[in-house]
Amino acid sequence: TASLCRYAIKHGFNGFQFLAGIPGSVGGAVSGNSGTALGHAGEIVREVWTMDSLGAERKVSGSQISWGYRSMNLPQGFAHKPVIILGAAFGFSPAQEEQNLEREYRLLLEGRKKTQPWGPGLAGCFFKNPPGLFSAGALIDRAGLKGFSVGDATVSPVHANFLVNRGKASAADFLLLMEKVADKVRRQSGVSLEPEVKVLS
């Protein structure tokens, strides 16, 4: 997503700025409908190329997809799921004459760096924000879990909805940390957190 965002800004394509600082691949951004308060992937996707579990490839229009909070639901007819995102086509609008895309991008990136952990070993926000007054990060913080670790998998002390690999954390470490965090939040706040990341196996 970082490369796509930079390419769009370099060529004056407006509407991609919300991707600034969002980690991961373009396929992951489409599959998870990545976004922020400024926009999300489903708003700019025009077509998606997929391959199902039997190897059959198919193209689907972005308007046929039901885009939800951190999710995309394909139309009926995709019997052999899950599908892999092979590619996507995006729509854009030209930047306005007075608009400075580079400045907008830089300000967004600087803002994220002040409020979120940065660098390798990150998967973005780990849990979906539940309905209600408090975000997932606020609930985890209220549970006193900033800095809590399982092996090298750690709840970021900067932003509690980021789980960070401090060096040699395994997938098992992250899964156990995810379970422990969700369990404590559920016991303390009565809220069941749902992972934003996709656990494949």
Regions found by a protein language model. Name each.
Residues T1-A29, T36:
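Anion-binding (especially nucleotide phosphate/pyrophosphate-binding) glycine-rich loop
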Residues T1-F13, H40-K59:
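N-terminal glycine-rich flavin-associated loop
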Residues T1-L4, L133, M178-E179:
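Generic non-transmembrane alpha-helix signal with a bias for helix starts/N-cap capping motifs
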Residues N14-F18, G28, E43-V48, S63-I65, ...:
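Generic beta-strand structural signal
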Residues G28-S31, A160-F162:
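Short secondary-structure transition/capping segments
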Residues G35-A37, M72:
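Short beta-turn/strand-loop junction motif enriched in small, turn-promoting residues
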Residues L38-G39, P117:
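Short Gly/Pro-enriched turn/cap motifs at secondary-structure boundaries
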Residues M51-L176, D183-K184, Q188-S201:
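Phosphate/pyrophosphate- and phosphate-bearing ligand-binding catalytic cores of soluble enzymes
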